[in-house]
Amino acid sequence: MLSDIPRDALLRPLTRNEVVGMLVRLTVFGAATYYSIKWVVDALDPTQKQKSQAKKRAEQLMKQIGVEGVSLTEYEMNIATLLVDPRSIKVTWRDVAGLDEIISEMQDTVILPFQKRHLFSGSKLLQPPKGVLLYGPPGCGKTLIAKATAKASGCRFINLQASTLTDKWYGESQKLTAAVFSLAVKIQPCIIFLDEIDSFLRNRSSMDHEATAMMKAQFMSLWDGLDTGENSQVMVMGATNRPQDVDAAILRRMPTAFHVGLPNAAQREEILRLILSGENLSNAINLKEIASQSEGYSGSDLKELCRDAAMYRVRDYVRKQQMKQIAQQFQLDEEEEHVDSRQLRPVTQLDLLFGLDKMRESKQATATTDPANLREVPLD
């Protein structure tokens, strides 16, 4: 083909139009190649749809909490999907009963330094702690306190899940771990909450997988290491019912620890009063009697007890309706009486005692009321 082109045409310089045309063709070819390769790579990536959804959700959450104009990496976008808007949390301090002392300490230690930072800027001793640990038996209100803290503080809140930091590709877990703290710094003041922290940051041993050990080490380094600023407004809050399984280096980074133990009789009465508030109760209700007979019960147990008691009136109503239907089959000439299903009898003391007996049988079957099973593990 080149032999058909005159020699003079090959040797002469290109005209302006020919240069522009060549550049246009090269640009179009390069763009087509780039987008073709990108389309193939995206099509082969099984997580592409998940990443796209995560990006949309992260942008929506960032807008809800009032963070705009902040550039996030791909890994920070994944962590941003775990953000919680404090305004969407329905739990307040009024929903926590029997823990007045802990609530007061939480307000002074955690919430006040974030809300009144100008009062604490002149002293290193008045800086908020880097970490806070809530520990105690299950069902005693640790997670409830964390929710109320997030609501009251008004800080950005990351509800971190351990599964979010695990990835099958080598090195990805470390990048996600780094993104947790880089995102928290960008949107500070921020609280990073780890529920059941013992399952993620448990005691290290030689049996740990290399990737897991590296992830724990990086988490601690970013949390409180050489690069950590003294004026950082990032706090890690954890909750566990097995503090003895949490690594010692993690406990060192959580100098402020609150023991949320089983409620005493007075606290149980207060919890029962809160749970039953707004319910249709009989005037003969004696919550002090129920509280005195529920030794070793957690707040979660008391809520289940009240739920069972409320169900007894529903069962009575259903049985009465069934008996009326049977009677109407033999009295077809009489007009059927209309009964409003919302009109249930009040919860009585007998209902609560029945619920207490049922809960006691359940706990005896699982041996959860045995004092040996309820002993507290000291937090060193």
Curated annotation (Swiss-Prot):
ATP binds at G136, P137, P138, G139, C140, G141, K142, T143. It is an enzyme of class 7 (translocase). Keywords: ATP-binding, Cell membrane, Membrane, Mitochondrion, Mitochondrion outer membrane, Nucleotide-binding, Peroxisome, Postsynaptic cell membrane, Synapse, Translocase, Transmembrane, Transmembrane helix. Pfam families: AAA, AAA_lid_3. GO terms for molecular function: ATP binding; ATP hydrolysis activity; membrane protein dislocase activity. The chain crosses the membrane at residues 19-37. It catalyses: [protein]-with a C-terminal TM segment(out) + ATP + H2O = [protein]-with a C-terminal TM segment(in) + ADP + phosphate + H(+). Residues 1-18 are mitochondrial intermembrane. It comes from the Eukaryota. Outer mitochondrial translocase required to remove mislocalized tail-anchored transmembrane proteins on mitochondria. Specifically recognizes and binds tail-anchored transmembrane proteins: acts as a dislocase that mediates the ATP-dependent extraction of mistargeted tail-anchored transmembrane proteins from the mitochondrion outer membrane. Also plays a critical role in regulating the surface expression of AMPA receptors (AMPAR), thereby regulating synaptic plasticity and learning and memory. Belongs to the AAA ATPase family. MSP1 subfamily. This is Outer mitochondrial transmembrane helix translocase. It comes from Danio rerio.
